[in-house]
């Protein structure tokens, strides 16, 4: 950070010469000098070059108006105003709050001014650095000798080996030297929440509107388990979104709780539509509890917000309606909701405390903010027992955390403070909306087919767009009013072949083919559905990346319309099975997969597969205990009906479990099996198009798709721990009496 911008006024020698002297002295101090052409050029420079650390301008020419504009972009950026001896400053006390320092045009004073600018720059850097990151930088600069972990000793061990030196050179000196031991007392402790680590957590809590925040260094998968372990004692009942992330299934395998599921909707595209409002009512929960063996009134609830596809809930409704004392919003995909007004009322930390309730929000900082992979946060609003919570925290946290991950989490929060954070998110929203409009324009102008966007017809308003029951674009005919909202930065493109009402067209282009084409051209899709592709317009997306995506999509249309050979369009796919794809053309491939989808009537099958849940025979915890006891056996997927699954079965997409450990597929839930069989059939017919299904594998010898089930008898009464587990205190609730 060493760039100073000078707005040079060449109208008078007595102004030009002092600035020329200052230029020379600033270069001696290690600064680089930029000369913007005009006011707009300067503001663009400030907006686009984050390494700018100061602005110099002539007070007579630019004065307070420019100072205010600079402050709007970066209120902490040092501003240096030069005035001649006879200038009228005309400033009041509120103006002096702007970060302006005044100097007089005078020959021979350049060295002194350059020294003051260096001091102001150092102070600026010190001010913008958050507490732990600042302490870490300071420690690394001190170059202390250590005789403790980690064994690479600031990278010196790597330099003792040829391959180690390559590793060192790739990652760099500061990465090595900042990887330090928890024995460094001046940095405090992540596990004890002391020193700069505690300061960092408090800094994050203020930034994210939380009462308490925790830094998690191994992802939101772990953050979810920490919250769940604290909130759900063994034998208790929890209310959980059936579209939960698999980490919450793992929580239920670790902690012997009884799950009661909130059932979400799904449209013909396979897009998750959220949980209806009726599912959150007391009457609905009473009915679920009554129909679930060993269930009592839930002590904890988990809701995924937003959904993977970018749908937010009206969280105020959930907080005030759901009669559960502890509510956890798994918000892994939306760590930015506190930094733009369109998300108000749609996030866990929105608004004030809810009396008598604890609200948790877990966020993957690394997913859509600027942090290292695995950086995550837990935010809390409400009263918790911090000592007990910390036991759950320590249970899941390494005693050797990577300080780079911790500091990146805090730095991500620092980047989002004030106007700077709002501008970053606003930029993402604007780029996403421009991209959406460009797709619609190209669709209108294209000959024949082109991609469409899953969105309302009118997106001129910068907002989270509501899914109303009177609109058809979203494909959820019975959706509640004022309940679900589409995030503009989650862009879902639609490929030809399927209408919003679930009608399969005569011809279609499965999205998996487009996804493979984009991958060939260096563009990775976030999620690929049957006829839709999800793209995330995070703060790291710029105009170049958006234009590259547009270009690749138009190129795909061209090669598809030309009906080129698969080996020329998708060479990686061709190399997987050259004999199979030798003469095949791209349209034949697309229509072949589309015909399979039509044969199975995918929209109807997908609807039925998620309409009826498998039978709960035992809790996920009990099923896992049977597995570790060895009471399991392999089973062909086709023969799974009537058997208890040992593992979760999770096809990707959509990336949520269709069968939980301890559940049995029955005649009523047969569509779940048919759905899985269809996914496997497509992969068997077309090499390279296998669906990744957690819990299902293909036997190399027989070619059959296999699962793991519990041995017969393992689920008999008396053989499973749940028969002896203590129930949570309290009786089953009735409509007449609150529990």
From Swiss-Prot:
Family matches, as InterPro entries: OKR_de-COase_N, Orn/lys/arg_de-COase, Orn/Lys/Arg_deCO2ase_major_dom, Prn/Lys/Arg_de-COase_C, Prn/Lys/Arg_de-COase_C_sf, PyrdxlP-dep_Trfase, PyrdxlP-dep_Trfase_major, PyrdxlP-dep_Trfase_small
Family matches, as Gene3D superfamilies: 3.40.50.2300, Aspartate Aminotransferase, domain 1 (3.90.1150.10), Orn/Lys/Arg decarboxylase, C-terminal domain (3.90.100.10), Type I PLP-dependent aspartate aminotransferase-like (Major domain) (3.40.640.10)
Modified sites of kind N6-(pyridoxal phosphate)lysine: 367
Subcellular location: Cytoplasm
Catalytic activity: L-lysine + H(+) = cadaverine + CO2
Cofactor needs: pyridoxal 5'-phosphate
Record region (Disordered): 714-739
Compositionally biased tracts (Basic and acidic residues): 714-726
Main location: cytoplasm
GO cellular component: cytosol
Protein name: Lysine decarboxylase
């Amino acid at each position: 950070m060493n760039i100073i911008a000078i707005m040079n006024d060449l109208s008078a020698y007595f102004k030009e010469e002092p600035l020329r002297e200052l230029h020379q002295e600033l270069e001696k101090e290690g600064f680089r000098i930029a000369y913007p052409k005009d006011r707009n050029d300067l503001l663009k420079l400030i907006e686009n070059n984050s390494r700018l650390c100061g602005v110099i301008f002539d007070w007579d020419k630019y004065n307070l108006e420019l100072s205010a504009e600079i402050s709007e972009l970066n209120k902490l950026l040092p501003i240096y105003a030069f005035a001649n001896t006879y200038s009228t400053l005309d400033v009041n006390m509120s103006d002096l709050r702007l970060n302006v320092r005044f100097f007089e045009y005078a020959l021979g004073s350049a060295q002194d001014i350059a020294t003051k600018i260096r001091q102001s720059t150092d102070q600026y850097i010190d001010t913008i650095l958050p507490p732990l990151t600042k302490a870490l930088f300071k420690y690394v600069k001190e170059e202390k000798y250590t005789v403790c972990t980690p064994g690479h000793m600031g990278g010196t061990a790597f330099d003792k080996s040829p391959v180690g030196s390559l590793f060192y050179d790739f990652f760099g000196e500061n990465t090595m030297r900042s990887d330090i031991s928890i024995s460094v007392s001046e940095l405090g402790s992540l596990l004890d929440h002391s020193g700069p680590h505690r300061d960092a957590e408090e800094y994050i809590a203020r930034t994210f509107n939380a009462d308490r925040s925790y830094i998690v260094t191994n992802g939101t998968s772990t953050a979810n388990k920490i919250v769940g372990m604290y909130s759900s004692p063994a034998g208790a009942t929890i209310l959980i979104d059936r579209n939960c992330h698999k980490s919450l299934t793992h929580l239920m395998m670790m902690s012997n709780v009884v799950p009661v599921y909130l059932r979400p909707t799904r449209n013909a595209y396979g897009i998750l539509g959220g949980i209806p409002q009726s599912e959150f009512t007391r009457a609905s929960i009473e009915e679920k509890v009554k129909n679930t063996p060993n269930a009592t009134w839930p002590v904890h609830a988990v809701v995924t917000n937003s959904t993977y596809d970018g749908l937010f809930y009206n969280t105020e409704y959930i907080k005030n309606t759901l009669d559960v004392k502890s509510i956890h919003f798994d918000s892994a995909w939306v760590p930015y909701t506190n930094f733009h007004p369109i998300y108000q009322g749609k996030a866990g930390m929105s608004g004030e405390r809810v009396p008598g309730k604890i609200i948790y929000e877990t966020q993957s900082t690394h997913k859509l903010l600027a942090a290292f992979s695995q950086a995550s946060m837990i935010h809390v609003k409400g009263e918790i027992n911090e000592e007990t919570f910390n036991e759950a925290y320590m249970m899941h946290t390494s005693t050797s955390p990577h300080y780079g991950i911790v500091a990146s989490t805090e730095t991500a929060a620092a980047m989002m403070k004030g106007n700077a954070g709002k501008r970053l998110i606003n930029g993402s929203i604007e780029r996403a909306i421009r991209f959406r409009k460009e797709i619609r324009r190209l669709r209108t102008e294209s000959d024949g087919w082109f991609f469409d966007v899953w969105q309302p017809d009118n997106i001129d308003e910068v907002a989270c767009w509501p899914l109303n029951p009177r609109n058809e674009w979203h494909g959820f005919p019975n959706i509640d009013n004022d309940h679900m909202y589409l995030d503009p930065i989650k862009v879902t493109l639609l490929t030809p072949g399927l209408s919003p009402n679930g009608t399969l067209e005569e011809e279609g282009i499965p999205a998996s083919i487009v996804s493979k084409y984009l991958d060939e051209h260096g563009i990775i899709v976030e999620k690929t559905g049957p006829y839709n592709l999800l793209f995330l317009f995070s703060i790291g997306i710029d105009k170049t990346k958006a234009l590259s995506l547009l270009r690749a999509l138009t190129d795909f249309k061209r090669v598809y319309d030309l009906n080129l050979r698969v080996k020329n369009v998708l060479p990686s796919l061709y190399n997987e099975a050259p004999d199979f794809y030798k003469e095949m053309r791209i349209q034949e491939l697309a229509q072949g997969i589309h015909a399979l989808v039509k044969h199975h009537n995918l929209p109807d099958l997908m609807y039925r597969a998620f309409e009826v849940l498998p039978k709960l025979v035992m809790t996920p915890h009990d099923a896992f205990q049977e597995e570790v006891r060895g009471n399991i056996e392999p089973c062909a997927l086709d023969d799974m009906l009537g058997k208890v699954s040992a593992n979760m079965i999770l096809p990707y997409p959509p990336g949520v479990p269709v069968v939980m450990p301890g559940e049995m597929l029955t005649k009523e839930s047969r569509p779940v099996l048919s759905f899985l069989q269809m996914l496997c059939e497509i992969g068997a017919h077309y090499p390279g198009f296998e669906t990744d299904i957690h819990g299902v594998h293909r036997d190399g010898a027989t070619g059959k798709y296999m699962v793991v089930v519990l041995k017969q008898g393992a689920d008999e009464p008396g053989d499973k721990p749940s028969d002896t587990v203590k129930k949570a205190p309290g009786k089953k609730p009735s409509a007449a009496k609150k529990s």
